[in-house]
Amino acid sequence: MATATPVPPRMGSRAGGPTTPLSPTRLSRLQEKEELRELNDRLAVYIDKVRSLETENSALQLQVTEREEVRGRELTGLKALYETELADARRALDDTARERAKLQIELGKCKAEHDQLLLNYAKKESDLNGAQIKLREYEAALNSKDAALATALGDKKSLEGDLEDLKDQIAQLEASLAAAKKQLADETLLKVDLENRCQSLTEDLEFRKSMYEEEINETRRKHETRLVEVDSGRQIEYEYKLAQALHEMREQHDAQVRLYKEELEQTYHAKLENARLSSEMNTSTVNSAREELMESRMRIESLSSQLSNLQKESRACLERIQELEDLLAKEKDNSRRMLTDKEREMAEIRDQMQQQLNDYEQLLDVKLALDMEISAYRKLLEGEEERLKLSPSPSSRVTVSRASSSRSVRTTRGKRKRVDVEESEASSSVSISHSASATGNVCIEEIDVDGKFIRLKNTSEQDQPMGGWEMIRKIGDTSVSYKYTSRYVLKAGQTVTIWAANAGVTASPPTDLIWKNQNSWGTGEDVKVILKNSQGEEVAQRSTVFKTTIPEEEEEEEEAAGVVVEEELFHQQGTPRASNRSCAIM
């Protein structure tokens, strides 16, 4: 370290002695000594300044080296990030295109369903018109039936009045019949009484006749005794007169008995005939009344059956009309609801398509911005190379679109702490083919190519219990199986996604399930997933096959599989490394 040269004390008048004039040589030496001292001080200051500058330069050089390393790492990270984002963008574009195609297919299906619904609606309208015509016919028939019913009711009322009259007549006739029966009983009793009297009279007559004969005999005996006394001349006359008198008495008595008997028989026969005639008249009247009553009852029953049939037909017509109206209202509601759902789905599809188009435009904007940034970086590096007069390193081409890449980083420590990054990109075109089949209500809708999830969907309109169901994933010779819980039910039209444990998704049953025992579903060139029910029968399967083809020329990659970005990395200070596709970063 330089130090200042001490200056000897100057002699002057203050030294305590008389001043002596200095010689010119002494003065020149003193001046030279003063100049050397000043130069020595300046040199010391300069050396200190140089040392401080060197120290600062070393610190700045270290900062520059660290900044260069950080910049290189940031550039490498930015490149990897750009590649990842570009791959994600490409994948998103592919997904968007696939989703757009799917949405277009669904839109076509929706249009076809809409046309079919319009046809069904037109058919339902024609059915409605036919039903309305039938309804009017039924109403006309119902009106005619109502008129007939009113007429039948009027006839029924009149017949009921006639029936009441006939019932009254029947009651009267029954009363007359009872009186006739009573009279007949009385006449029968009278007949019996008369017969008894006749029998008693006959017996009395016989008794009297016997007594009369006894009297005659007694008289005859008396007359014989008298005849003995009487003259024999008058005996013949007397006997003649006696016989004549007896004969007259007998005839008179027989005539009286015959007259009395004839009178009794005539009276009996007259009363019996009157009773018989009265009974016959009453019987005929009762029979006619009964016949009229039966006819009235039959007519009333027929009218009642007709009335009940008409009422049944009327109720059936009303029920049919109500059923048709309910069915028509239900069909209208279903058609309106289906049209509303389809319109809402179409609006959602349009919104999704618009959102996807917006996302696609944003991705294009991001891609253009990244291209502009890459171009700006390239121009900046070229300007730095021209300014530093560095030879440009060979450009490395990076292909991002389903490309397999391998990267090796080699770090060499030396005097300048340089890091060499070597990249090699092997571009390839990858085609993915999917095949799926299902024999039941549940199908395998999607298999994630990264092995994060598998999605199932219930395509039916009924809930599907999946207790004991098993899903098997096969990749080559390896296979894993996932079993559903006994209470799990997949709702109608619902999808369920089974995520791997490392997918970074939280469980949200019943639509999102986490397989905690499996970190990934696995990836490979040939992935096959089989769904089996609780009986072990295969109900659905889906396979994904990756086919890799290497193009003949690397320049065709941009057109066939992705976006090609040329990226040149240059060394900003020092001599560039002479390695293929490499750059040296300070």
Curated annotation (Swiss-Prot):
Q: Which GO terms describe its cellular component?
A: lamin filament; membrane; nuclear envelope; nuclear inner membrane; nuclear lamina; nuclear matrix; nuclear membrane; nucleoplasm
Changing A152G has the effect of: In MCPH26; decreased protein abundance; changed localization to nuclear lamina; changed nuclear envelope organization
Which residues does the annotated region (Coil 1B) include?
82-215
Q: Which domain of life is it from?
A: Eukaryota
**Residues bearing the modification N6-acetyllysine:** K111, K157, K271, K330, K483
Where the protein is mainly located, per its record?
nucleus
Record-annotated IF rod domain positions: 32-388
Per its UniProt record, what InterPro entries does this chain match? Answer: IF_conserved, IF_rod_dom, Lamin_tail_dom, Lamin_tail_dom_sf
- Quick one: where's region Disordered? 1-31, 388-432
Name under which the protein is recorded: Lamin-B1
Identify the stretch(es) annotated as Linker 2. Answer: 216-243
PTM Omega-N-methylarginine: list the residues: R14, R413
Q: What family classification does the UniProt entry report for this protein?
A: Belongs to the intermediate filament family.
Q: Where in the cell is it found?
A: Nucleus lamina
Quaternary structure, from the entry: Homodimer. Lamin dimers then assemble into dimeric head-to-tail polymers. Ultimately, two head-to-tail polymers assemble laterally into a protofilament with a uniformly shaped rod of 3.5 nm in diameter. Interacts with SPAG4 and SEPT12.
Q: Where is this motif: Nuclear localization signal?
A: 415-420
| Organism of provenance | Homo sapiens
Residue ranges of the region described as Linker 1? 70-81
Which residues in this protein are found as Phosphothreonine? T3, T5, T20, T25, T575
The molecular function terms in GO held by this entry are:
phospholipase binding; sequence-specific double-stranded DNA binding; structural constituent of cytoskeleton; structural constituent of nuclear lamina
Give the position of the cross-link Glycyl lysine isopeptide (Lys-Gly) (interchain with G-Cter in SUMO2). K102, K123, K145, K157, K181, K241, K261, K271, K312, K330, K532, K547
The organism's taxonomy opens as:
Eukaryota, Metazoa, Chordata, Craniata, Vertebrata
Gene name in the database record: LMNB1
- Identify residues that carry Cysteine methyl ester: C583
Region Tail, annotated ranges: 387-586
